[in-house]
Regions:
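Primarily recognizes the serine-hydrolase "nucleophile elbow" in alpha/beta-hydrolase
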Residues: 168-247, 325, 330-340
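Catalytic-loop region of hydrolases
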Residues: 23-95
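Alpha/beta-hydrolase active-site loop
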Residues: 151-172, 594-598
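C-terminal subdomain of alpha/beta-hydrolase-fold enzymes, centered on the catalytic histidine
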Residues: 372-604
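Short beta-strand element of the alpha/beta-hydrolase
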Residues: 64, 80-86, 96-112, 116, ...
Protein backbone atom coordinates (compact mmCIF):
# COMPACT_ATOMS: atom_id res chain seq x y z
CA UNK A 1 0.00 0.00 0.00
CA UNK A 2 2.81 2.43 0.91
CA UNK A 3 4.51 1.64 -2.38
CA UNK A 4 1.26 2.29 -4.25
CA UNK A 5 0.75 5.65 -2.49
CA UNK A 6 4.33 6.64 -3.21
CA UNK A 7 3.85 5.86 -6.89
CA UNK A 8 0.60 7.84 -6.99
CA UNK A 9 2.29 10.83 -5.33
CA UNK A 10 5.15 10.68 -7.80
CA UNK A 11 2.68 10.52 -10.68
CA UNK A 12 0.74 13.49 -9.30
CA UNK A 13 3.98 15.46 -8.91
CA UNK A 14 4.91 14.68 -12.50
CA UNK A 15 1.52 15.89 -13.73
CA UNK A 16 1.90 19.02 -11.63
CA UNK A 17 5.31 19.72 -13.16
CA UNK A 18 3.97 19.15 -16.66
CA UNK A 19 1.06 21.48 -15.92
CA UNK A 20 3.37 24.17 -14.57
CA UNK A 21 5.60 23.77 -17.60
CA UNK A 22 2.62 24.18 -19.91
CA UNK A 23 0.96 27.02 -18.04
CA UNK A 24 4.13 28.97 -17.19
CA UNK A 25 6.57 30.52 -19.56
CA UNK A 26 6.20 29.47 -23.18
CA UNK A 27 8.66 26.95 -24.58
CA UNK A 28 9.99 26.46 -28.10
CA UNK A 29 8.02 24.21 -30.41
CA UNK A 30 9.45 20.76 -30.91
CA UNK A 31 10.96 19.75 -34.23
CA UNK A 32 8.41 18.93 -36.92
CA UNK A 33 9.63 15.58 -38.17
CA UNK A 34 7.73 16.01 -41.46
CA UNK A 35 9.87 18.98 -42.52
CA UNK A 36 13.29 17.47 -43.10
CA UNK A 37 15.18 18.25 -46.29
CA UNK A 38 17.80 16.08 -47.92
CA UNK A 39 21.21 16.86 -49.41
CA UNK A 40 21.81 13.85 -51.62
CA UNK A 41 25.42 14.71 -52.48
CA UNK A 42 26.40 14.46 -48.81
CA UNK A 43 23.67 12.05 -47.67
CA UNK A 44 22.50 14.48 -45.00
CA UNK A 45 19.02 15.25 -43.69
CA UNK A 46 18.70 18.79 -42.38
CA UNK A 47 16.43 21.44 -40.99
CA UNK A 48 17.12 25.11 -40.37
CA UNK A 49 15.16 27.93 -38.78
CA UNK A 50 14.53 25.93 -35.62
CA UNK A 51 13.86 28.36 -32.78
CA UNK A 52 15.56 27.34 -29.56
CA UNK A 53 14.11 30.32 -27.70
CA UNK A 54 10.38 30.91 -27.22
CA UNK A 55 10.88 34.61 -26.45
CA UNK A 56 14.12 35.45 -28.28
CA UNK A 57 15.98 38.65 -27.61
CA UNK A 58 17.04 38.73 -31.26
CA UNK A 59 15.21 36.33 -33.55
CA UNK A 60 17.59 37.14 -36.40
CA UNK A 61 20.23 35.12 -34.56
CA UNK A 62 18.48 32.79 -32.13
CA UNK A 63 17.64 29.87 -34.40
CA UNK A 64 19.59 26.78 -35.34
CA UNK A 65 20.03 24.08 -37.94
CA UNK A 66 20.48 20.37 -37.36
CA UNK A 67 22.38 18.19 -39.84
CA UNK A 68 22.03 14.40 -39.55
CA UNK A 69 23.86 11.60 -41.40
CA UNK A 70 21.40 9.98 -43.78
CA UNK A 71 21.82 6.47 -42.36
CA UNK A 72 20.38 7.57 -39.02
CA UNK A 73 16.90 8.21 -40.44
CA UNK A 74 14.25 6.19 -42.17
CA UNK A 75 12.65 8.72 -44.50
CA UNK A 76 9.45 8.97 -46.51
CA UNK A 77 9.36 11.41 -49.42
CA UNK A 78 6.50 13.87 -48.99
CA UNK A 79 6.60 14.80 -52.67
CA UNK A 80 7.23 18.49 -52.01
CA UNK A 81 10.96 18.43 -51.36
CA UNK A 82 10.55 17.49 -47.71
CA UNK A 83 10.75 14.18 -45.89
CA UNK A 84 9.09 12.63 -42.89
CA UNK A 85 11.81 11.01 -40.81
CA UNK A 86 12.04 8.58 -37.94
CA UNK A 87 15.18 7.34 -36.23
CA UNK A 88 16.72 4.21 -37.71
CA UNK A 89 18.41 2.81 -34.62
CA UNK A 90 20.35 0.26 -36.64
CA UNK A 91 21.75 2.91 -38.96
CA UNK A 92 25.56 2.99 -38.87
CA UNK A 93 28.17 5.45 -40.07
CA UNK A 94 31.80 4.73 -39.27
CA UNK A 95 32.16 3.67 -35.65
CA UNK A 96 28.77 5.08 -34.61
CA UNK A 97 25.13 4.11 -34.75
CA UNK A 98 22.06 6.34 -34.62
CA UNK A 99 22.01 5.68 -30.87
CA UNK A 100 25.70 6.20 -30.08
CA UNK A 101 26.58 9.09 -32.41
CA UNK A 102 28.14 12.20 -30.84
CA UNK A 103 26.94 15.71 -31.63
CA UNK A 104 29.03 18.84 -32.13
CA UNK A 105 28.18 22.52 -31.79
CA UNK A 106 30.57 24.92 -33.57
CA UNK A 107 31.22 28.30 -31.98
CA UNK A 108 32.53 30.51 -34.78
CA UNK A 109 32.66 33.87 -33.00
CA UNK A 110 36.03 35.60 -33.51
CA UNK A 111 36.29 38.55 -31.16
CA UNK A 112 33.13 37.32 -29.41
CA UNK A 113 31.18 38.36 -32.52
CA UNK A 114 27.65 37.30 -33.35
CA UNK A 115 27.17 34.07 -35.28
CA UNK A 116 24.38 33.91 -37.83
CA UNK A 117 22.29 30.76 -37.98
CA UNK A 118 22.15 28.86 -41.27
CA UNK A 119 19.27 29.67 -43.61
CA UNK A 120 19.87 26.74 -45.94
CA UNK A 121 22.19 23.81 -46.43
CA UNK A 122 25.63 25.23 -45.66
CA UNK A 123 28.60 23.34 -46.98
CA UNK A 124 30.81 25.19 -44.48
CA UNK A 125 30.28 25.80 -40.79
CA UNK A 126 33.56 27.57 -40.12
CA UNK A 127 35.59 24.56 -38.99
CA UNK A 128 35.59 22.42 -42.09
CA UNK A 129 32.43 21.37 -43.92
CA UNK A 130 29.22 19.81 -42.67
CA UNK A 131 30.07 16.63 -44.56
CA UNK A 132 33.49 16.39 -42.90
CA UNK A 133 31.58 15.51 -39.75
CA UNK A 134 28.46 13.75 -41.01
CA UNK A 135 30.56 11.42 -43.16
CA UNK A 136 32.19 10.29 -39.91
CA UNK A 137 28.82 9.72 -38.25
CA UNK A 138 28.74 12.96 -36.26
CA UNK A 139 25.56 15.05 -35.95
CA UNK A 140 26.01 18.82 -36.34
CA UNK A 141 24.10 21.37 -34.24
CA UNK A 142 24.61 24.65 -36.11
CA UNK A 143 23.27 27.47 -33.94
CA UNK A 144 23.20 31.20 -34.38
CA UNK A 145 23.97 33.36 -31.36
CA UNK A 146 24.15 36.98 -30.33
CA UNK A 147 27.53 38.64 -30.15
CA UNK A 148 29.49 41.12 -28.11
CA UNK A 149 27.23 44.05 -29.03
CA UNK A 150 24.49 42.35 -27.00
CA UNK A 151 26.81 42.14 -23.98
CA UNK A 152 27.91 39.12 -21.97
CA UNK A 153 26.51 36.59 -21.23
CA UNK A 154 24.31 36.72 -24.36
CA UNK A 155 26.46 34.54 -26.62
CA UNK A 156 27.03 31.63 -24.26
CA UNK A 157 23.41 31.86 -23.11
CA UNK A 158 22.29 31.30 -26.69
CA UNK A 159 24.59 28.34 -27.27
CA UNK A 160 23.38 26.81 -24.01
CA UNK A 161 19.78 27.29 -25.14
CA UNK A 162 20.56 25.52 -28.42
CA UNK A 163 22.10 22.57 -26.58
CA UNK A 164 19.05 22.37 -24.33
CA UNK A 165 16.76 22.46 -27.36
CA UNK A 166 18.54 19.50 -28.94
CA UNK A 167 18.05 17.51 -25.74
CA UNK A 168 14.44 18.67 -25.56
CA UNK A 169 13.98 16.76 -28.82
CA UNK A 170 15.88 13.66 -27.75
CA UNK A 171 12.78 11.52 -28.25
CA UNK A 172 12.77 12.52 -31.92
CA UNK A 173 16.44 12.86 -32.85
CA UNK A 174 19.24 10.33 -33.23
CA UNK A 175 22.46 10.67 -31.28
CA UNK A 176 23.86 10.23 -27.81
CA UNK A 177 22.69 13.40 -26.08
CA UNK A 178 25.22 12.83 -23.31
CA UNK A 179 27.99 13.23 -25.88
CA UNK A 180 27.86 16.81 -27.14
CA UNK A 181 31.15 18.55 -28.00
CA UNK A 182 31.73 22.27 -28.53
CA UNK A 183 34.53 23.67 -30.68
CA UNK A 184 35.78 27.16 -31.34
CA UNK A 185 38.74 29.39 -32.15
CA UNK A 186 39.79 32.71 -30.55
CA UNK A 187 36.66 34.32 -29.09
CA UNK A 188 34.91 31.15 -30.23
CA UNK A 189 37.52 29.11 -28.39
CA UNK A 190 36.79 31.18 -25.31
CA UNK A 191 33.06 30.57 -25.57
CA UNK A 192 33.69 26.88 -26.21
CA UNK A 193 35.72 26.84 -22.99
CA UNK A 194 32.86 28.54 -21.18
CA UNK A 195 30.35 26.03 -22.52
CA UNK A 196 32.71 23.31 -21.30
CA UNK A 197 33.26 24.81 -17.84
CA UNK A 198 29.85 26.25 -16.92
CA UNK A 199 27.47 23.38 -17.59
CA UNK A 200 24.15 23.94 -15.78
CA UNK A 201 25.49 26.94 -13.84
CA UNK A 202 22.71 28.64 -11.88
CA UNK A 203 24.13 32.02 -12.86
CA UNK A 204 22.78 31.48 -16.37
CA UNK A 205 19.28 30.48 -15.26
CA UNK A 206 17.66 33.94 -15.35
CA UNK A 207 19.26 34.72 -18.71
CA UNK A 208 18.03 31.44 -20.19
CA UNK A 209 14.56 32.02 -18.77
CA UNK A 210 14.49 35.53 -20.23
CA UNK A 211 14.74 34.20 -23.80
CA UNK A 212 12.34 31.32 -23.24
CA UNK A 213 14.92 28.55 -23.36
CA UNK A 214 14.00 25.02 -22.36
CA UNK A 215 14.49 24.98 -18.60
CA UNK A 216 14.05 21.24 -18.05
CA UNK A 217 17.15 20.06 -19.93
CA UNK A 218 20.89 20.18 -19.28
CA UNK A 219 23.34 22.40 -21.16
CA UNK A 220 26.46 20.53 -19.97
CA UNK A 221 28.72 19.05 -22.64
CA UNK A 222 31.05 16.08 -22.73
CA UNK A 223 33.93 17.83 -24.45
CA UNK A 224 35.32 21.25 -25.30
CA UNK A 225 37.76 22.03 -28.11
CA UNK A 226 39.48 25.40 -27.75
CA UNK A 227 41.94 26.88 -30.24
CA UNK A 228 43.71 30.01 -28.94
CA UNK A 229 40.92 30.87 -26.48
CA UNK A 230 40.80 34.56 -25.55
CA UNK A 231 39.56 33.92 -22.05
CA UNK A 232 40.26 34.27 -18.30
CA UNK A 233 39.38 37.93 -18.84
CA UNK A 234 39.41 38.82 -15.15
CA UNK A 235 43.21 38.52 -15.20
CA UNK A 236 43.99 38.65 -18.94
CA UNK A 237 45.36 42.21 -18.92
CA UNK A 238 47.67 41.37 -16.05
CA UNK A 239 48.86 38.10 -17.59
CA UNK A 240 49.58 39.92 -20.83
CA UNK A 241 51.94 42.38 -19.13
CA UNK A 242 53.68 39.66 -17.09
CA UNK A 243 54.20 37.70 -20.29
CA UNK A 244 54.91 40.35 -22.93
CA UNK A 245 55.48 43.61 -21.08
CA UNK A 246 59.22 43.30 -21.69
CA UNK A 247 58.64 43.66 -25.43
CA UNK A 248 57.11 47.13 -25.11
CA UNK A 249 59.11 50.26 -25.75
CA UNK A 250 58.54 53.99 -25.68
CA UNK A 251 56.08 53.90 -22.78
CA UNK A 252 55.35 56.99 -20.77
CA UNK A 253 55.98 56.91 -17.03
CA UNK A 254 52.27 56.40 -16.43
CA UNK A 255 52.00 53.62 -19.01
CA UNK A 256 55.04 51.87 -17.57
CA UNK A 257 53.49 52.06 -14.14
CA UNK A 258 50.32 50.43 -15.41
CA UNK A 259 52.31 47.68 -17.14
CA UNK A 260 54.43 46.97 -14.06
CA UNK A 261 51.45 47.15 -11.75
CA UNK A 262 49.50 44.64 -13.79
CA UNK A 263 52.50 42.29 -13.94
CA UNK A 264 52.83 42.42 -10.16
CA UNK A 265 49.12 41.74 -9.79
CA UNK A 266 49.44 38.66 -11.98
CA UNK A 267 52.18 37.26 -9.76
CA UNK A 268 49.95 37.73 -6.73
CA UNK A 269 47.10 36.05 -8.60
CA UNK A 270 49.19 33.01 -9.55
CA UNK A 271 50.42 32.59 -5.99
CA UNK A 272 46.83 32.42 -4.77
CA UNK A 273 45.50 30.23 -7.57
CA UNK A 274 46.76 26.92 -6.21
CA UNK A 275 47.93 25.41 -9.48
CA UNK A 276 50.01 22.24 -9.40
CA UNK A 277 51.84 20.32 -12.09
CA UNK A 278 51.27 16.66 -12.96
CA UNK A 279 53.59 15.63 -10.12
CA UNK A 280 51.72 17.65 -7.52
CA UNK A 281 54.32 20.41 -7.29
CA UNK A 282 52.81 23.77 -6.36
CA UNK A 283 53.30 26.30 -9.15
CA UNK A 284 54.17 29.72 -7.78
CA UNK A 285 56.15 32.80 -8.73
CA UNK A 286 59.01 34.39 -6.82
CA UNK A 287 60.82 37.69 -6.96
CA UNK A 288 63.74 37.86 -9.34
CA UNK A 289 66.80 39.99 -9.92
CA UNK A 290 65.68 40.80 -13.44
CA UNK A 291 62.15 41.51 -14.53
CA UNK A 292 59.06 41.28 -12.39
CA UNK A 293 58.66 38.00 -10.51
CA UNK A 294 60.49 35.98 -13.16
CA UNK A 295 61.37 33.06 -10.93
CA UNK A 296 59.71 30.16 -9.12
CA UNK A 297 58.15 26.86 -10.10
CA UNK A 298 55.45 28.45 -12.26
CA UNK A 299 58.11 30.31 -14.22
CA UNK A 300 60.14 27.12 -14.60
CA UNK A 301 57.05 25.32 -15.88
CA UNK A 302 56.51 28.02 -18.47
CA UNK A 303 60.13 27.90 -19.57
CA UNK A 304 60.05 24.13 -19.90
CA UNK A 305 56.90 24.30 -21.99
CA UNK A 306 58.53 26.70 -24.45
CA UNK A 307 61.57 24.46 -24.71
CA UNK A 308 59.43 21.39 -25.31
CA UNK A 309 57.48 23.21 -28.00
CA UNK A 310 60.66 23.81 -29.98
CA UNK A 311 61.79 20.23 -29.38
CA UNK A 312 58.55 18.99 -30.91
CA UNK A 313 58.98 21.29 -33.88
CA UNK A 314 62.47 19.97 -34.51
CA UNK A 315 61.37 16.34 -34.24
CA UNK A 316 58.29 16.84 -36.41
CA UNK A 317 59.77 18.97 -39.17
CA UNK A 318 61.58 17.62 -42.19
CA UNK A 319 64.63 19.61 -43.24
CA UNK A 320 65.39 21.40 -45.54
CA UNK A 321 62.61 23.56 -44.16
CA UNK A 322 61.17 26.74 -45.65
CA UNK A 323 59.76 29.29 -43.23
CA UNK A 324 56.24 30.31 -44.20
CA UNK A 325 56.63 34.02 -43.58
CA UNK A 326 59.14 36.65 -42.57
CA UNK A 327 57.24 37.80 -39.51
CA UNK A 328 57.76 35.70 -36.44
CA UNK A 329 59.35 32.29 -36.73
CA UNK A 330 58.87 28.95 -38.32
CA UNK A 331 55.83 27.94 -40.25
CA UNK A 332 53.67 24.86 -40.04
CA UNK A 333 55.40 22.86 -37.37
CA UNK A 334 55.41 21.36 -33.95
CA UNK A 335 53.54 22.56 -30.95
CA UNK A 336 54.85 21.92 -27.52
CA UNK A 337 53.90 19.65 -24.72
CA UNK A 338 55.10 19.50 -21.14
CA UNK A 339 57.89 17.02 -20.57
CA UNK A 340 56.69 13.97 -18.72
CA UNK A 341 53.11 15.16 -18.50
CA UNK A 342 49.97 14.16 -20.31
CA UNK A 343 49.47 17.66 -21.57
CA UNK A 344 51.87 20.34 -22.56
CA UNK A 345 51.83 24.03 -22.19
CA UNK A 346 52.72 27.44 -23.29
CA UNK A 347 53.05 30.28 -20.98
CA UNK A 348 55.55 32.78 -20.33
CA UNK A 349 56.38 35.83 -18.62
CA UNK A 350 58.34 38.93 -18.24
CA UNK A 351 56.84 42.23 -17.32
CA UNK A 352 57.92 45.70 -18.24
CA UNK A 353 61.55 46.67 -17.93
CA UNK A 354 60.96 48.36 -14.61
CA UNK A 355 62.11 47.06 -11.24
CA UNK A 356 58.68 46.01 -10.04
CA UNK A 357 58.00 49.23 -8.16
CA UNK A 358 54.99 51.28 -9.19
CA UNK A 359 55.85 54.98 -9.40
CA UNK A 360 53.71 57.38 -7.38
CA UNK A 361 51.49 59.26 -9.82
CA UNK A 362 48.50 61.26 -9.28
CA UNK A 363 35.87 50.03 -31.82
CA UNK A 364 35.74 47.91 -34.60
CA UNK A 365 32.58 46.51 -36.30
CA UNK A 366 31.61 42.97 -35.36
CA UNK A 367 31.71 40.39 -38.11
CA UNK A 368 28.24 39.26 -39.14
CA UNK A 369 28.38 36.05 -41.09
CA UNK A 370 25.32 36.56 -43.23
CA UNK A 371 23.03 33.68 -44.14
CA UNK A 372 24.90 31.32 -41.88
CA UNK A 373 27.75 30.96 -44.36
CA UNK A 374 30.89 30.65 -42.29
CA UNK A 375 34.32 31.26 -43.75
CA UNK A 376 36.13 27.94 -44.00
CA UNK A 377 39.37 28.07 -42.07
CA UNK A 378 40.31 24.50 -42.79
CA UNK A 379 43.13 25.38 -45.16
CA UNK A 380 46.63 26.64 -44.61
CA UNK A 381 47.29 28.06 -41.16
CA UNK A 382 48.77 31.27 -42.52
CA UNK A 383 45.47 31.95 -44.27
CA UNK A 384 43.54 31.18 -41.12
CA UNK A 385 45.54 33.66 -39.09
CA UNK A 386 44.97 36.47 -41.59
CA UNK A 387 41.27 35.72 -41.79
CA UNK A 388 40.67 35.81 -38.06
CA UNK A 389 42.60 39.00 -37.50
CA UNK A 390 40.73 40.70 -40.33
CA UNK A 391 37.33 39.62 -39.06
CA UNK A 392 37.32 39.82 -35.28
CA UNK A 393 37.18 43.60 -34.89
CA UNK A 394 39.89 43.58 -32.21
CA UNK A 395 42.28 46.51 -31.94
CA UNK A 396 45.92 45.61 -32.57
CA UNK A 397 49.08 47.59 -33.14
CA UNK A 398 49.88 48.39 -36.76
CA UNK A 399 53.09 46.40 -36.54
CA UNK A 400 53.07 43.13 -34.61
CA UNK A 401 56.21 41.49 -35.97
CA UNK A 402 58.70 40.15 -33.47
CA UNK A 403 62.24 41.42 -33.22
CA UNK A 404 63.48 38.27 -34.94
CA UNK A 405 62.45 37.61 -38.52
CA UNK A 406 62.86 34.21 -40.12
CA UNK A 407 62.42 33.61 -43.83
CA UNK A 408 63.81 31.45 -46.55
CA UNK A 409 64.97 27.86 -46.46
CA UNK A 410 66.98 26.25 -43.67
CA UNK A 411 68.96 23.24 -44.86
CA UNK A 412 69.51 21.71 -41.42
CA UNK A 413 68.21 21.96 -37.89
CA UNK A 414 71.50 23.53 -36.87
CA UNK A 415 70.89 26.26 -39.46
CA UNK A 416 67.48 26.91 -37.96
CA UNK A 417 68.87 27.18 -34.43
CA UNK A 418 71.55 29.54 -35.71
CA UNK A 419 68.84 31.73 -37.24
CA UNK A 420 67.02 31.86 -33.91
CA UNK A 421 70.25 33.13 -32.35
CA UNK A 422 70.95 35.70 -35.06
CA UNK A 423 70.55 38.62 -32.65
CA UNK A 424 72.33 36.94 -29.75
CA UNK A 425 72.35 33.43 -28.35
CA UNK A 426 69.30 32.46 -26.30
CA UNK A 427 68.67 28.91 -27.58
CA UNK A 428 70.91 25.86 -27.34
CA UNK A 429 70.06 22.45 -28.79
CA UNK A 430 71.54 19.05 -28.07
CA UNK A 431 71.13 17.14 -31.32
CA UNK A 432 71.76 13.72 -29.79
CA UNK A 433 68.95 14.01 -27.24
CA UNK A 434 66.85 16.65 -29.03
CA UNK A 435 66.94 18.77 -25.89
CA UNK A 436 66.36 22.52 -26.13
CA UNK A 437 67.38 25.03 -23.48
CA UNK A 438 66.50 28.72 -23.57
CA UNK A 439 68.16 31.37 -21.44
CA UNK A 440 64.88 32.84 -20.21
CA UNK A 441 61.22 33.30 -20.97
CA UNK A 442 61.99 36.98 -21.54
CA UNK A 443 64.45 36.08 -24.29
CA UNK A 444 61.77 34.03 -26.03
CA UNK A 445 59.15 36.76 -25.90
CA UNK A 446 61.62 39.45 -26.96
CA UNK A 447 62.65 37.39 -29.97
CA UNK A 448 59.42 35.77 -31.03
CA UNK A 449 56.34 36.85 -29.08
CA UNK A 450 55.98 40.62 -29.05
CA UNK A 451 52.94 42.39 -27.64
CA UNK A 452 50.47 43.16 -30.41
CA UNK A 453 47.99 45.06 -28.25
CA UNK A 454 48.24 48.25 -26.27
CA UNK A 455 47.86 48.87 -22.53
CA UNK A 456 45.63 47.33 -21.36
CA UNK A 457 45.32 44.59 -23.97
CA UNK A 458 41.67 43.71 -23.35
CA UNK A 459 40.47 46.71 -21.35
CA UNK A 460 41.40 49.83 -23.27
CA UNK A 461 41.38 52.97 -21.21
CA UNK A 462 39.08 54.57 -23.79
CA UNK A 463 36.70 51.57 -23.64
CA UNK A 464 37.44 50.90 -27.30
CA UNK A 465 38.52 47.26 -27.28
CA UNK A 466 36.22 44.41 -28.32
CA UNK A 467 36.15 43.02 -24.79
CA UNK A 468 35.01 46.43 -23.52
CA UNK A 469 32.00 46.08 -25.81
CA UNK A 470 31.49 42.51 -24.59
CA UNK A 471 31.05 43.79 -21.05
CA UNK A 472 28.92 46.71 -22.14
CA UNK A 473 25.17 46.80 -21.68
CA UNK A 474 23.68 45.75 -24.99
CA UNK A 475 23.93 49.09 -26.76
CA UNK A 476 27.16 48.33 -28.62
CA UNK A 477 29.17 50.69 -26.42
CA UNK A 478 32.15 49.61 -24.36
CA UNK A 479 32.44 49.55 -20.58
CA UNK A 480 35.27 48.98 -18.12
CA UNK A 481 35.45 45.62 -16.33
CA UNK A 482 38.99 45.07 -14.95
CA UNK A 483 38.87 45.65 -11.18
CA UNK A 484 42.67 45.39 -10.85
CA UNK A 485 43.22 48.06 -13.46
CA UNK A 486 40.57 50.16 -11.73
CA UNK A 487 42.81 50.25 -8.65
CA UNK A 488 45.87 51.16 -10.70
CA UNK A 489 44.16 54.13 -12.36
CA UNK A 490 42.99 55.68 -9.10
CA UNK A 491 44.02 59.30 -9.02
CA UNK A 492 44.09 59.51 -12.81
CA UNK A 493 41.58 60.87 -15.31
CA UNK A 494 40.18 57.35 -15.74
CA UNK A 495 39.22 56.73 -12.11
CA UNK A 496 35.64 58.00 -12.35
CA UNK A 497 34.83 56.11 -15.55
CA UNK A 498 36.06 52.84 -14.06
CA UNK A 499 34.11 53.35 -10.84
CA UNK A 500 30.91 54.14 -12.70
CA UNK A 501 31.16 51.17 -15.05
CA UNK A 502 31.99 48.67 -12.30
CA UNK A 503 28.88 49.77 -10.40
CA UNK A 504 26.44 49.53 -13.33
CA UNK A 505 23.83 46.79 -13.49
CA UNK A 506 22.49 44.98 -16.52
CA UNK A 507 18.81 44.36 -17.27
CA UNK A 508 18.73 41.47 -14.80
CA UNK A 509 20.36 43.45 -12.01
CA UNK A 510 23.87 42.01 -12.21
CA UNK A 511 27.03 44.11 -12.01
CA UNK A 512 29.95 43.41 -14.30
CA UNK A 513 31.81 41.29 -11.73
CA UNK A 514 29.02 38.70 -11.88
CA UNK A 515 28.99 38.72 -15.67
CA UNK A 516 32.78 38.48 -15.71
CA UNK A 517 32.58 35.39 -13.52
CA UNK A 518 30.05 33.89 -15.91
CA UNK A 519 32.53 34.45 -18.74
CA UNK A 520 35.53 33.02 -16.92
CA UNK A 521 36.10 29.24 -17.12
CA UNK A 522 38.50 29.47 -14.18
CA UNK A 523 35.62 30.66 -12.00
CA UNK A 524 34.12 27.19 -12.34
CA UNK A 525 37.29 25.10 -12.53
CA UNK A 526 39.57 26.57 -9.87
CA UNK A 527 39.07 26.22 -6.09
CA UNK A 528 40.42 29.77 -5.77
CA UNK A 529 37.06 31.05 -7.04
CA UNK A 530 33.64 31.00 -5.39
CA UNK A 531 32.15 29.29 -8.43
CA UNK A 532 34.21 26.14 -7.97
CA UNK A 533 32.01 23.01 -8.10
CA UNK A 534 28.85 25.01 -8.90
CA UNK A 535 28.67 23.64 -12.44
CA UNK A 536 29.09 20.40 -14.38
CA UNK A 537 32.30 20.82 -16.40
CA UNK A 538 33.21 18.76 -19.43
CA UNK A 539 35.08 15.52 -18.90
CA UNK A 540 37.18 15.96 -22.05
CA UNK A 541 39.23 18.99 -23.11
CA UNK A 542 41.40 19.66 -26.13
CA UNK A 543 43.31 22.96 -26.10
CA UNK A 544 45.70 24.19 -28.77
CA UNK A 545 47.53 27.47 -29.19
CA UNK A 546 50.07 29.03 -31.51
CA UNK A 547 52.95 29.80 -29.19
CA UNK A 548 53.99 33.04 -30.91
CA UNK A 549 50.60 34.74 -31.00
CA UNK A 550 50.50 38.23 -29.55
CA UNK A 551 46.76 38.11 -28.93
CA UNK A 552 46.90 36.73 -25.40
CA UNK A 553 49.42 35.58 -22.84
CA UNK A 554 50.71 32.03 -22.94
CA UNK A 555 49.44 31.80 -19.38
CA UNK A 556 45.84 31.80 -20.59
CA UNK A 557 45.84 28.33 -22.08
CA UNK A 558 48.17 26.70 -19.59
CA UNK A 559 46.17 27.90 -16.59
CA UNK A 560 42.98 26.65 -18.22
CA UNK A 561 44.54 23.27 -18.96
CA UNK A 562 45.97 22.85 -15.46
CA UNK A 563 42.69 23.80 -13.79
CA UNK A 564 40.65 21.49 -16.01
CA UNK A 565 43.07 18.61 -15.41
CA UNK A 566 42.89 19.05 -11.65
CA UNK A 567 39.13 19.51 -11.44
CA UNK A 568 38.12 15.87 -11.17
CA UNK A 569 39.75 12.47 -11.35
CA UNK A 570 39.40 11.09 -14.83
CA UNK A 571 39.18 14.43 -16.62
CA UNK A 572 41.00 14.12 -19.93
CA UNK A 573 43.03 17.14 -21.03
CA UNK A 574 44.89 17.13 -24.34
CA UNK A 575 46.87 20.38 -24.42
CA UNK A 576 49.76 21.40 -26.64
CA UNK A 577 51.37 24.52 -28.00
CA UNK A 578 52.41 24.89 -31.62
CA UNK A 579 55.82 26.29 -32.43
CA UNK A 580 55.87 28.60 -35.40
CA UNK A 581 52.16 29.44 -35.38
CA UNK A 582 50.20 32.40 -34.12
CA UNK A 583 46.52 33.19 -33.65
CA UNK A 584 45.06 30.35 -35.66
CA UNK A 585 43.63 26.82 -35.45
CA UNK A 586 47.09 25.70 -34.47
CA UNK A 587 47.99 22.05 -34.87
CA UNK A 588 51.31 20.30 -34.49
CA UNK A 589 50.65 18.11 -37.54
CA UNK A 590 47.69 17.44 -39.80
CA UNK A 591 44.51 19.48 -40.19
CA UNK A 592 42.50 20.98 -37.36
CA UNK A 593 39.26 19.37 -38.56
CA UNK A 594 40.69 15.85 -38.89
CA UNK A 595 42.47 16.12 -35.56
CA UNK A 596 39.32 17.31 -33.81
CA UNK A 597 37.29 14.43 -35.25
CA UNK A 598 39.95 11.93 -34.16
CA UNK A 599 39.89 13.41 -30.65
CA UNK A 600 36.10 13.09 -30.45
CA UNK A 601 36.45 9.46 -31.48
CA UNK A 602 38.95 8.88 -28.67
CA UNK A 603 36.64 10.52 -26.14
CA UNK A 604 33.80 8.24 -27.25
CA UNK A 605 35.73 5.03 -26.58
Amino acid sequence: MKKFLACMMAFALMLSCVSCFAEGESVPAKIDMTKWQYEAADDVYWQVGLSYAATPADSSYETMGIFVPGAYFTAADNGDGTYTCTVNESGTVGQYTAVTAPLIIPVNTPGYSAMAAPTGYSSSMGYGSISDYTSEGIIVLFAGARGRDAGAPAGVTDFKAAIRYARYNKDLLPGDMDSIFSLGMSGGGAQSALIGASGNSDLYTPYLAAIGAVMTESDAVKGSMCWCPITNLDIADEAYEWNMGNTRSGLSEEEQAYSDGMALAFAEYINGLGLTDENGTALVLAESEEGIWQSGTYYDYVKDVIETSLEHFLSDTEFPYTAASSGGFGGRGGRGGMRGGNFGGTEGGFAGPGNGEIPDFGNGEKPDFANGEMPDFGGENAEQETAYEEMDGITRAESTSSALSLSGTYETKQDYIAALNANGEWVTWDEETNTVTITSVAAFTQALKNASKGIAAFEQLDRGQGENTLFGYGDGNGAHFDAILAELVQGSEYETAFAEDLAKQDALGNTVDVRLNMYNPMYYLSPAYEGYQTSEPAACWRIRTGINQGDTALCTEIDLALAAEAYAEGTQVDFETVWGQGHTEAERTGSSTANFIAWVQECMK
